[in-house]
């Protein structure tokens, strides 16, 4: 009676649901879960590895520490596993927060801080406050992200937004044939022209470009590796940061730990294939990771007092949830120990 109860009909039985099956608590009906809690479920319900660690999960849930300032051995153990299993060696700066939208928010704040400080070092003031983004993008429902998200208008209309440059999203059409390739290359050229126009109009005001490796809510839109290579080249040429929003595409759902790890010369199916890996400067993560946040690379360190080195420049009360971190640690260990990425690839090829 106190909430907008417009969700699905089944009542989730937390104890009896199992594997990929949701059990309705009212009558025991089982439903094959094709929803996976908005892609946040990773190893199903009541996985044996989770159940083996019920006591640990219960213990860390009894009190919620403020991890920005108070550290625990469980936090350190989680970071060890995260580093070992999922953090790329080119993204070693880490920040945790609760919520995927807030993860993106802080990616943007890092970029604004980086660009504005660079401008100030050159004597340029009041510049570095815009984000390039794409049509049909979904990056969240919070402050800055409202200016990026443009899928269902009900999620953004009537809320104040920034007028940041919105770029054509040159996604592939399937099946991929000669005409589809001609069409997508034309759309890529248009997108690059729009990016260059925004840069030419105000060359010092673009802090970053953000893109989902695969647009999820926008329509399951896939892009060519060649396009990501163009974005990387433009980011280096025009001195803005390249952000991949991996909230929905991370932690194995594509057969790689992160979707952008498919963008390699050996895996690229473009003609010709890309020559270099278009690695991001920042990625945002959430959903399957349980705890949300960002990873950032070496370009951030081009600014001495960047947001990762200045105390409280980016921060939150809790710095993520310790319970979520411990659960994510167990998930990562399960993905690693059961070789689930290989299983995802094999299943994907079969389908």
Residue spans of the language-model regions?
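Conserved N-terminal phosphate-binding loop of PLP-dependent enzymes in the Aspartate aminotransferase
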Residues: 1-351
């Amino acid at each position: 009676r106190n909430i907008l109860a417009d969700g699905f009909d089944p009542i989730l039985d937390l104890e009896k649901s199992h594997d990929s099956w949701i059990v309705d608590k009212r009558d025991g009906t089982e439903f094959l879960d094709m929803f996976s809690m908005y892609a946040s479920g990773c190893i199903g319900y009541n996985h044996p590895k989770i159940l083996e660690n019920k006591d640990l999960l219960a213990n860390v849930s009894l009190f919620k520490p403020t991890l920005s300032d108070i550290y625990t051995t469980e936090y350190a153990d989680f970071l060890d596993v995260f580093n070992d299993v999922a953090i790329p060696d080119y993204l070693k700066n880490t920040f945790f927060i609760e919520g995927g939208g807030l993860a993106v928010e802080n990616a943007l704040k890092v970029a604004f801080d980086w660009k504005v400080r660079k401008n100030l070092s050159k004597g340029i003031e009041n510049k570095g406050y815009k984000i390039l983004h794409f049509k049909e993008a979904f990056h969240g429902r919070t402050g800055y992200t409202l200016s990026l998200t443009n899928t269902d208008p009900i999620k953004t209309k009537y809320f104040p937004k920034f007028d940041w440059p919105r770029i054509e999203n040159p996604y592939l059409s399937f099946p991929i044939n000669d005409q589809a390739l001609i069409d997508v290359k034309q759309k890529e050229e248009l997108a690059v022209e729009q990016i260059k126009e925004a840069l030419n109009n105000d060359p010092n005001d673009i802090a970053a470009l953000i893109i989902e490796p695969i647009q999820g809510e926008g329509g399951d839109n896939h892009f060519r590796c060649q396009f990501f290579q163009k974005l990387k080249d433009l980011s280096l040429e025009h001195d803005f940061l390249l952000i991949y929003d991996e909230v929905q595409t991370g932690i194995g759902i594509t057969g790689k730990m992160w979707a952008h790890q498919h963008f390699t010369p050996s895996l690229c199916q473009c003609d010709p294939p890309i020559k270099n890996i278009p690695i991001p400067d920042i990625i945002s993560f959430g959903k399957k990771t349980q705890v949300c946040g960002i990873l950032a690379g070496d370009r951030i360190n081009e600014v001495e007092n960047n947001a990762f080195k200045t105390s409280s420049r980016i921060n939150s009360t809790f710095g993520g949830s310790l319970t979520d971190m411990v659960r994510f640690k167990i998930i990562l260990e399960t993905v690693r120990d059961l070789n689930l990425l290989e299983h995802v690839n094999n299943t994907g090829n079969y389908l």
